[in-house]
């Protein structure tokens, strides 16, 4: 049997997978010299020789088996692509061959070890993932719902609004009642002696409502609430006011002193009342007694203080409403300013007399330099004459004197 030499050559393609080529050189058939490569050979013979000399991995294993049988025919197979096999690399490394084969086999063994490590890591990951499943289903400790960090939320009951009790309402009513009681002014006293002709009405002095005048002043009553004990008997009646037009020049009222009704003049007020402008507002029990009346200046003191005692070249608006159109009683006063709001007097059940039930026969309206006398359709003549007196203590007294009808 001819002597053969086997050379294991491991080459790297793309630095990934080696493959082994087994070359069987026969001294008789193959020329090993360098010149032999320069000689042209037949292609068919070379292909056959290559097929005979190239062996696959499995054929090499069977070739180097312990039996040592050489009966099997050597076959060569061309490997078209790279092939990786850790088992083959491990087997090749155990071969007892030359230095070149051992170095290549050692490199192959390293790649095999690396691949085995990767396989072990993947196996461990698979085992871990397989262990997590039964722990989740069969062990409640691993469930996050029952761990110490779990949070349990309980549904809170909706808040129910507590209705207000009767005590709260009583307290609020008390507060309102106390507020109304504090804001109410003092009542006005009415003194009417029985079986007498002269009746007097005393008004308390109101220091805050007084307007400063050079000579003297009268108090102005504020709006007061109804304080009557018998509300069914209204004390005041409506007096239709006269529409007032502004006058270009201030004119003093000219009244007829020869009135058939007579005149009562108070001695205390005759000194200063003859030269003062005045205005007597209507007496009413309701605030809506004269809704159409234009706004009238409440006091003449502003004009007096600005232009002196007797204003000149100032527009003055004034009107006269008295019990008698030709009466000179109103000329004795500077001003009678009473509130047009509802005012009730307590303890009055007698017959209404005086200015409280006064309907004027005629009304005087002054416009410029002319004096117009305008009759009123609804006329109720009373035999009463009013007079207002300034007292020393600062309070005013309104005296009503009854006279027989003529």
From Swiss-Prot:
Native organism: Arabidopsis thaliana
Misc. comment: PKS1, PKS2 and/or PKS4 are essential for phototropism but not for inhibition of gravitropism under long-term blue light irradiation.
Keyword Transmembrane helix: no
Superkingdom, natural source: Eukaryota
Listed PANTHER family: PROTEIN PHYTOCHROME KINASE SUBSTRATE 1-RELATED (PTHR33781), PROTEIN PHYTOCHROME KINASE SUBSTRATE 4 (PTHR33781:SF1)
UniProt protein name: Protein PHYTOCHROME KINASE SUBSTRATE 4
Summary of the function given for this chain in its UniProt record: Modulates phytochrome-mediated control of hypocotyl growth orientation. Involved in PHYA and PHYB signaling. Acts as an inhibitor of asymmetric growth. Not involved in the control of leaf flattening.
Summary of the tissues where the protein is detected: Expressed in the hypocotyl elongation zone. Not found in the root elongation zone.
Factors inducing expression: Down-regulated by light.
Compositionally skewed regions (Polar residues) per UniProt: 106-119
Any one of the GO BP annotations: red or far-red light signaling pathway
Reported phenotype of the disruption mutant: Reduced phototropic response. Altered light-induced deviation from vertical growth and decreased phytochrome-mediated inhibition of hypocotyl elongation and cotyledon opening. No visible phenotype at the level of leaf flattening and leaf positioning. No effect on negative root phototropism.
Subunit note: Interacts in vitro with PHYA and PHYB.
Entry keyword Amino-acid biosynthesis: no
Protein keywords: Phytochrome signaling pathway
Region ranges (Disordered): 106-133
Family statement drawn from the similarity comment of this UniProt entry: Belongs to the PKS family.
């Amino acid at each position: 049997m001819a002597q053969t030499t086997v050379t294991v050559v491991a080459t790297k393609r793309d630095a990934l997978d080696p493959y082994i080529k087994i070359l069987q050189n026969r001294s008789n058939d193959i020329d090993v010299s360098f010149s032999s490569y320069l000689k042209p050979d037949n292609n068919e013979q070379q292909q056959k020789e290559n097929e005979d000399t190239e062996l696959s991995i499995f054929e090499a294993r069977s070739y180097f088996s312990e039996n040592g049988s050489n009966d099997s025919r050597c076959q060569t197979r061309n490997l078209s692509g790279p092939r990786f096999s850790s088992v083959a690399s491990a087997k090749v490394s155990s071969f007892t061959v030359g230095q070149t084969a051992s170095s290549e086999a050692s490199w192959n063994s390293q790649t095999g070890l690396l691949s085995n490590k990767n396989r072990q890591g993947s196996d461990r990951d698979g085992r871990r993932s397989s262990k997590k499943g039964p722990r989740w289903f069969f062990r409640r400790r691993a469930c996050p719902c029952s761990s110490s960090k779990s949070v349990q939320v309980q549904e809170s009951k909706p808040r129910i609004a507590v209705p207000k009790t009767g005590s709260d309402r009583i307290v609020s009513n008390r507060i309102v009642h106390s507020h109304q009681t504090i804001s109410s002014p003092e009542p006005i006293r009415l003194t009417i002696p029985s079986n007498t002709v002269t009746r007097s009405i005393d008004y308390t002095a109101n220091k805050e409502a007084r307007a400063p005048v050079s000579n003297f002043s009268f108090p102005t009553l504020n709006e007061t609430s109804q304080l009557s004990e018998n509300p069914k008997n209204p004390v005041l009646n409506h007096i239709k006011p006269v529409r007032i037009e502004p006058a270009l020049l201030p004119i003093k009222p000219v009244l007829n002193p020869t009135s058939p009704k007579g005149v009562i003049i108070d001695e205390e007020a005759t000194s200063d009342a003859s030269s003062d402008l005045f205005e007597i507002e209507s007496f009413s029990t309701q605030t809506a007694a004269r809704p159409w009346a234009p706004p009238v200046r409440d006091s003449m003191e502003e004009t007096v203080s600005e232009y002196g005692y007797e204003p000149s070249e100032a527009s003055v608006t004034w009107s006269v409403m008295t019990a008698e159109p030709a009466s000179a009683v109103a000329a004795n006063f500077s001003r009678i300013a009473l509130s047009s709001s509802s005012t009730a007097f307590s303890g009055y059940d007698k017959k209404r007399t005086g200015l409280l039930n006064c309907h004027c026969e005629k009304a005087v309206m002054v416009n410029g330099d002319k004096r117009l006398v305008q009759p009123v359709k609804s006329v109720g003549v009373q035999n009463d004459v009013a007079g207002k007196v300034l007292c020393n203590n600062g309070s005013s007294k309104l005296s009503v004197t009854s006279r027989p009808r003529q």
